[in-house]
Amino acid sequence: MELPLSQHSFCKLLLLVVSSLLLWEKAASIPACLAEEGGCWNPLVETFNSAIHKAETLYDLANQIHVELYQNKFSSEQFSSLNSQVIRKDKTALRAGSYCHSTLINTPNKENEHINIEIKEYVKTLINFVGAWISPLYHLVLELSAMQDVPESILSKAKEIEENNRQLLDDLKWILIKVSPTEEMKEEFPSWGHLSFLKSSGEKSKFLAMFNLSNCLGYDAKYTLLNLRILKCLTTGKDC
C-alpha cells in the first residue's frame, strides 16, 4: 500500500532525526581532543612543541650568524679588533663581550628552583626573558638594512632570528593564558644597554653593539630552549 505524501514526509523526517541522534551519540563518545587520525590532539602540547621548535631554530641561527660575523669580510676585521681589546681587558669591549642585558631578569638557575616555582610565574619569567630580545633584534634588522655592503646572508639570518623570537613570544603568551586564564601579565622587558651604540652614526659603535648581541644571543637561546623543555614537562607531563 502506498503511503500518503504527508506520512511519507513524516517517515523521512523521523529517519533523519534518528540518524542525527545516532551520530550525536557516536560523537559524544569520542574524546573532545580527538581531532586527528592517530590520537588525541592537545593544543597546549602542540603550542609547547611549536615554541620549542622556534627556540631550536633561534639557537641554530644565532650560532650561524655569530660565526658569519666573525668570518665575513663585512665585519671580521671589526670583530677581530674587539676580541683583541677583550684580551687586553679594555672595559668597553670586555663588557660588550661578556655582559648580557637578559641577566637583569630573575630566572631559575638551580634544579630545585625549577621545581618549586609556580607554573604561571615560570611562564611569565620566560616571557620577559624572550621579550628582552624584541627591541634589540628589531633595531638590528633596521640598522643592517640601512648599512652599506651588508651581505644578504647576514641580513636574512637577522630577519629570520627576529621573526622566530617574536613568534616564540606569542606562543609563550598563549601558554600563559591557558595555564592561568585570569592572570594579568605585566611585561617588564629590560632595556638593552648597547641600543644607543647600534643606532649611532659611527661604524665602530654599531659593530660593538653587534659584538655584544652575537655573544649573548646564542647563550640566551640555549637557555630558553632548556627551560621550555622543563616547563613543558612540568605543565603537560610530556617528554620528561
From Swiss-Prot:
Glycans are attached at N212. SUPFAM superfamilies: 4-helical cytokines (SSF47266). InterPro entries: 4_helix_cytokine-like_core (IPR009079), Somatotropin/Prolactin (IPR001400). Disulfide bonds join C33-C40, C100-C216, C233-C240. Keywords: Disulfide bond, Glycoprotein, Hormone, Secreted, Signal. Transmembrane segments: none annotated. Gene3D superfamilies: 1.20.1250.10. Placental basal zone cells. GO terms for molecular function: hormone activity; prolactin receptor binding. It holds the Pfam family Hormone_1. Its main location: secreted. GO terms for cellular component: extracellular space. Residues 1-29 form the signal peptide. GO terms for biological process: cell surface receptor signaling pathway; female pregnancy; mammary gland development; positive regulation of lactation; positive regulation of receptor signaling pathway via JAK-STAT; response to nutrient levels. It is found in: Secreted. Belongs to the somatotropin/prolactin family. This is Prolactin-8A7. The lineage of its organism: Eukaryota, Metazoa, Chordata, Craniata, Vertebrata.
